[in-house]
Amino acid sequence: MKRIALFLLTNVAVVVVLGIVASLLGVNRYLTANGLNLGALLGFAFIMGFGGAIISLLMSKPIAKMSMGVQIINAPRNADEAWIVETVRRFSEKAGIQMPEVGIYEGEPNAFATGAFKNSALVAVSTGLLQGMTREEVEAVIGHEVAHVANGDMVTMALIQGVMNTFVVFLSRVIGYAVDSFLRRNDENSSGPGIGYMITTIVLDIVLGFLAAIIVAWFSRQREFRADAGAAQLMGRKQPMINALHRLGGMRPGAMPQSLQAMGITGNIGKLFSSHPPIEERVAALQNSQSA
């Protein structure tokens, strides 16, 4: 709950800073002269930016269960399920968090963690992961996901996404008004936003959205390095995580929804937009780390 409160306070602080900077630069007077209220725009940017991020965060568990077909292990039906639950329990105690829900789903090798609160999260592994790895390697992957939960990565990434969303919404509309005002500077009968505003806003929403995605992906990759190190600490040595990464490098990872990729063990391709670093970089980081 503390992280959610911090999330909201940080978001409000960002909006306040945007308002102060806009006022100091004279943007407030310019927007008012052209029929746009700065406070209303900031409120709109806050709702669109942070509202979407917080809703996505709060809905992450039910969406994950539904979209991935996750079966929650309430009562283990076999030795594998009992081992998974016990492994998550052991790592959770060691990481100082409450026991997450544990699930399993049909699919290619992958795993993920999700949830708005680190003491009521979900850790799920695929059947492909269980079939394609040794138990020690699966244990390392589970440690990686528990580390994501313990580090509060779900809230952190939602916060970063919310900040980026707000900047995109705010900047695209301020620039849109500036372009529209310039294009209609000699039209004394014009009122309200025109076609210049609408086109500029749409284009900038797309362009700035891509730039924001690159920034969010960069932060996600840094969290992956930290989760790898966390798995090594939970296991007491780093070689199992290194072995698991090598194994994943030779597998075809299972697809996951975009909202879950950042908390999985492998992510989408494309260096700039990838939520995960290349396998070789993760292995090198572990080998050079001071983890066990």
UniProtKB/Swiss-Prot annotation:
One annotated GO molecular function: zinc ion binding
Any Gene Ontology biological process: proteolysis
Cofactors that this protein relies on: Zn(2+)
Annotated compartments: Cell inner membrane
Recorded topology in the membrane: Multi-pass membrane protein
Domain of life of the organism encoding this protein: Bacteria
Any one GO CC term of the record: plasma membrane
HAMAP family, A to Z: Pept_M48_protease_HtpX (MF_00188)
The name this protein goes by in its record: Protease HtpX homolog
Organism from which the protein derives: Acidovorax sp. (strain JS42)
Encoding gene (name): htpX
